[in-house]
């Protein structure tokens, strides 16, 4: 993912700039001395020629390095690609042909081929690849524990561990969730979500609660956990702050964690509008009617914030009772196009005949037009 040699290139650029500064300094001294008759013309000419020679040498070295670097990396990438394809073929034949793979240690392209197979395959074949990765004793956990490893090298190691999905490597990942570098923290969170299983989910949840990641990153981690997300979501709901609570509520709806639907209901009375909206979205995605919370839904339907009214109108339709029908009828008079749309779709879901009445007799012309439009689309 990252080209190697950037440190040598940075050092070479620094040397070029340093030599140019020396050359310019020598020119300033020589010509200033000549200006005040302190030096003769030969000294000034010698300084000028030395500066020109030094500049030419520095630029030649820099240009040669850039050309050689690109030529070398292009040929190396081609060799690595061929080696990767060769190892991929050998491992595939061993996997489906029932033969043992070549004995380790394996080079870097071989490990990359194993990671690709681990990502593509499921079930028994994937577990066999995991065993081969364990036999290879890959360097990625050791890289993470090395104090002087570069940032790109650590990111590569975290990405490789995420692809390998070996539960025993979680302990090497968790310390990076408290790393001062936010990029490494995010990479560690993604890797931990791919790796954690069983008791490791509890340790991952505790580390995430202390990681200080933004809500979008936390939600991404929960979605990566997929069917393993419930313990982490429960930890967020119990001990999380605003960011963790929002991510947990979003994940409950997107992952269809129906057993946690009861935990969402109290957030309908949340003062924070973002958390309340997340709770409304979660219940709607779960198709979980909030029985006993009708008053809070009606209050949200009258809120000054449009996004809350939209979510409340959608969720009211799940109640399927007369109270919800009357509330959605009134919502057809809302000044917001999106609220009227949500109300009309909710009435269509509950009682198409009632929506047909709204299309004919609703007092608000915009409400009638919306009801007619939704009926035409449903026809």
What do the predicted segments below correspond to?
Residues 48-56, 61-148:
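N-terminal topogenic membrane-targeting module
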Residues 1-84:
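N-terminal alpha-helical membrane-insertion module
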Residues 111-113, 130-147, 166-177, 197-208, ...:
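Amphipathic alpha-helical scaffolding segments comprising HEAT/armadillo-like alpha-solenoid repeats
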Residues 182-288:
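Extracytoplasmic/periplasmic C-terminal soluble domains
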Residues 132, 160, 191-194, 220-224, ...:
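Core register positions within helices of long alpha-helical scaffolds
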């Amino acid at each position: 993912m990252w080209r190697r040699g950037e440190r040598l290139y940075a050092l070479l650029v620094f040397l070029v700039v340093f030599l140019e500064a020396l050359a310019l300094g020598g020119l300033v001294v020589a010509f200033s001395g000549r200006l005040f008759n302190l030096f003769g013309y030969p000294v000034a000419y010698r300084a000028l020629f030395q500066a020109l020679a030094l500049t030419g040498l520095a630029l030649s070295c820099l240009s040669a390095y850039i050309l050689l670097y690109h030529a070398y990396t292009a040929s190396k990438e081609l060799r690595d690609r061929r080696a990767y394809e060769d190892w991929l073929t050998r491992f595939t034949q061993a996997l489906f042909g029932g033969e043992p793979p070549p004995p380790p240690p394996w080079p870097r392209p071989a490990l990359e081929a194993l990671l690709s197979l681990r990502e593509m395959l499921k079930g028994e074949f994937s577990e066999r690849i995991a065993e081969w990765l364990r036999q290879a004793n890959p360097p990625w956990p050791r890289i993470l524990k090395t104090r002087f490893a570069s940032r790109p090298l650590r990111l590569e190691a975290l990405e490789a561990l995420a692809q390998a999905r070996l539960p025993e490597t979680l302990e090497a990942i968790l310390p990076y969730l408290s790393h001062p570098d936010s990029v490494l923290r995010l990479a560690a969170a993604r890797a931990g979500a791919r790796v954690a299983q069983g008791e490791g989910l509890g340790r991952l949840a505790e580390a995430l609660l202390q990681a200080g990641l933004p809500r979008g990153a936390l939600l991404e981690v929960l979605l990566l956990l997929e069917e393993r997300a419930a313990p982490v979501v429960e930890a967020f709901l119990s001990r999380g702050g605003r960011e963790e609570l929002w991510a947990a509520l979003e994940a409950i709806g997107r992952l269809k964690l129906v057993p946690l639907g009861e935990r969402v209901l109290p957030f309908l009375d949340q003062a924070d509008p973002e958390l309340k909206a997340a709770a409304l979205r979660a219940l709607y995605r779960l198709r979980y009617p909030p029985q006993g919370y009708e008053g809070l839904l009606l209050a949200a339907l009258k809120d000054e914030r449009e996004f809350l009214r939209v979510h409340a109108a959608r969720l009211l339709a799940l109640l399927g009772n007369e109270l919800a029908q009357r509330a959605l009828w009134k919502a057809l008079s809302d000044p917001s196009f999106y609220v009227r749309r949500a109300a009309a779709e909710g009435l269509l879901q509950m009682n198409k005949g009632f929506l047909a009445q709204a299309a004919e007799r609703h007092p608000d012309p915009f409400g009638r037009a919306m009801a007619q439009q939704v009926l035409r689309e449903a026809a």
